[in-house]
Amino acid sequence: MQPPRRLDSAQQMEEPMQTDAPERSRASLPLSQLLTLSIYWLGIQTIWGGLNITIIPGRLDDLSRETQGTMLAIIMIAGAVAPIVIQPTVGVISDYTVTRWGRRKPYIVIGALLDVVFLAGIAFSNDFVALVAFYFLLQVSSNFAQGPFQGYVPDLVPAKQVGTASGLMGLMLTLGTIVGVGIATLGGITDQLPLATLALGFVEVVTMVILVATVDEGRAGPKRTRPWREIAMSAWARDILEQRDVLWLLLVRLMFLGAYNATLIAIGYFRRSQGLSDADADTIVFVATAIVGVSTALAAIPGGRLSDRFGRRPVIWTAGLIAAIGLVGVTIAPNPAFAVGSWIPFGIGMGLFLSADWALMADVIPKETAGRYMGILNAGTAMAGPVFIIVAGPIQDLTAAAFGDPVGPRVAMAVAAVFLGISALALTRVDPRRRELGDGALVGSGA
């Protein structure tokens, strides 16, 4: 049995005119290495799944049920600022970084360790202002790591395996959500929520160590001919306006992932719209999250391969339709069982989307500065929750005040379905053909 090929991005990421071997000639990577490249997603999503779905909404609901939606919007807005600025900026800096450990690893290690510090702040915060402050700082540190980390797929994965790598990423995100919500739910049941919050960070650090210890990314990046300040400022330079497909895809991701953030109001939905007690609502949200997770996982791997065969856009359109059916079911559900069952098509749609979406991102970005553009596109992920809550949160509170408490969360679920429709329309403007390294050539059909 041959030893696994070492992952070396240095040969792939020189300046465009100096690249000898085209990207499409890379040898295939073993499944074990694709898993290694994806494992850190599990750690990242463990934190955000546990916080955003269970811990933060539950704590805000305890502070003030009447204004929970508005407070959630405030904390999400505060959290959105950091990803928009930090992720593309640190991503493009890492594109040009040269260290003995490689370009991306130093940022990943620093970000993951700081995550634990700021999670401790969240765990022991006793008021809303402190909670917002530490949530913002956690977004800063997490995105300090995520921006460079997202450059790995375009750096290291050959074009023919991007769909599979994207599916594995979707799987890890799903597993991370299940693990995070499971830890948070257990912490709530045992009245050990601060300890559970710290445990989220422990899981992330473990996955970070696995990633850093097993991936050899090489040391060299493109030759730096500009000062670091100029490179950092270039993250959102005006040349991004020339990348119309990247901008449209940013809107696609913003809307689709915004709909996914309907899970943020699941606690309030089951407490208020379905009339469950706090303890029962927490338990059923974990069950619903597990169902969504399993459905997403089952769809993620085949979704990536289906997108390789039939094209990225058809798979994403199908994903949107299936997820919308699930959201409509949740909106009109007459009882908790019907609502939980409706999360199944929602999860399937999300799994298909996550696999095809990541592959489409890797296809359309300019490869010379992958960290920059993956960071920009992932700003859609960072902004998705805040944008959804900014829209759906006040609508939830207003409709609840006008038509009764149970109505608000149902209307917010319907807003998520509208987001999916907007995403589908925006996708029609994205040219899905693959861009190769160096010459900007478009490869393949327009599926």
Please place each PLM-identified region on the residue numbering:
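Helix-loop boundary and gating motifs at the non-cytosolic
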Residues: 21-80, 245-252, 256-275
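Glycine-rich segments within core transmembrane alpha-helices of 12-TM secondary carriers
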Residues: 83-84, 163-185, 378-389
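Multi-pass alpha-helical transporter architecture, strongest
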Residues: 123, 206-215, 414-447
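A membrane-interface helix-boundary motif in multi-pass transporters
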Residues: 103, 186-202, 394-419
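Juxtamembrane intracellular "pre-TM" segments in multi-pass secondary transporters
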Residues: 15-30, 218-251, 443-447
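Structural signature of the two symmetry-related core transmembrane helices
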Residues: 104-120, 314-329
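Helix-to-loop junctions at the C-terminal end of transmembrane segments
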Residues: 86-101, 299-311
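Intracellular juxtamembrane helix-capping segments at the cytosolic ends
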Residues: 56, 144-157, 353-366
